[in-house]
Amino acid sequence: MEQQKIPQATAKRLPLYYRFIQNLSLSGKQRVSSAELSEAVKVDSATIRRDFSYFGALGKKGYGYNVNYLLSFFRETLDQDDITRVALIGVGNLGTAFLHYNFTKNNNTKIEMAFDVSEEKVGTEIGGIPVYHLDELEERLSTDIQVAILTVPATVAQSVADRLAETNVHGILNFTPARLNVSESIRIHHIDLAVELQTLVYFLKNYPQ
């Protein structure tokens, strides 16, 4: 996607389109219109058409989009045939939930190992995923693991991120409230659940539907 120079906002919507198109294909549907896509993914039709236009002619006016063609296109664009191996750091309540879930709907994304400092958890398996001591982080992280999920206490998030920066990890999904400072070679996505909830409550009160 980087080579095609598409806007980041468009890139963020591609997995959303792909998931819906997967469901359409499984249901046996052969074609879909931008209006149908819009209703399903809650993105306006004009935005969908503009997003798709960055990749050339994906559909035909008056016909819509061929579902199997879109499925094949997005699978290749999103590298769905390549396995993304992930490490999780912090096996608290949220981390444990991730280990049990382990992206079961995304066959190309797998948490392969987890790290914690709790003696009760180190040396065990949760959801079939081995849990190692945090002291083993650099030793255990192989060159195959390029993404880390951070679910540690905010007070230690930066120090863990600093250690990850010394490995082959290039992407961090940060679920802590801490705003991390790392080199530009590492991409961080921050997801603060408390902030998301506060934002939702604000919109419910001030922008009623």
Curated annotation (Swiss-Prot):
The record's annotation in InterPro entries points to: CoA-bd, NAD(P)-bd_dom_sf, Rex_DNA-bd_C_dom, Tscrpt_rep_Rex, WH-like_DNA-bd_sf, WH_DNA-bd_sf
Where is the protein localized?
Answer: Cytoplasm
Q: Does the keyword Transcription regulation apply?
A: yes
Matching PANTHER family: REDOX-SENSING TRANSCRIPTIONAL REPRESSOR REX, REDOX-SENSING TRANSCRIPTIONAL REPRESSOR REX 1
| Origin organism lineage | Bacteria, Bacillati, Bacillota, Bacilli, Bacillales
Name the job this protein performs. Modulates transcription in response to changes in cellular NADH/NAD(+) redox state.
Q: Which gene encodes it?
A: rex
Which family does the record assign?
Belongs to the transcriptional regulatory Rex family.
- The name this protein carries in UniProt is Redox-sensing transcriptional repressor Rex
GO CC, any one term: cytoplasm
Matching entries from SUPFAM superfamilies are given as:
NAD(P)-binding Rossmann-fold domains, Winged helix' DNA-binding domain
By its UniProt entry, which NCBIfam families does this protein fall under? PRK05472.1-3, PRK05472.1-5, PRK05472.2-3, PRK05472.2-4, PRK05472.2-5
Question: Which residues, as ranges, make up the DNA-binding region of this protein?
Answer: 16-55
Family matches, as Gene3D superfamilies: NAD(P)-binding Rossmann-like Domain, Winged helix-like DNA-binding domain superfamily/Winged helix DNA-binding domain
Biological processes annotated in GO = negative regulation of DNA-templated transcription; response to redox state
Any GO molecular function: DNA-binding transcription factor activity
**Self-association and partners:** Homodimer.
Q: What is the species of this protein?
A: Bacillus thuringiensis (strain Al Hakam)
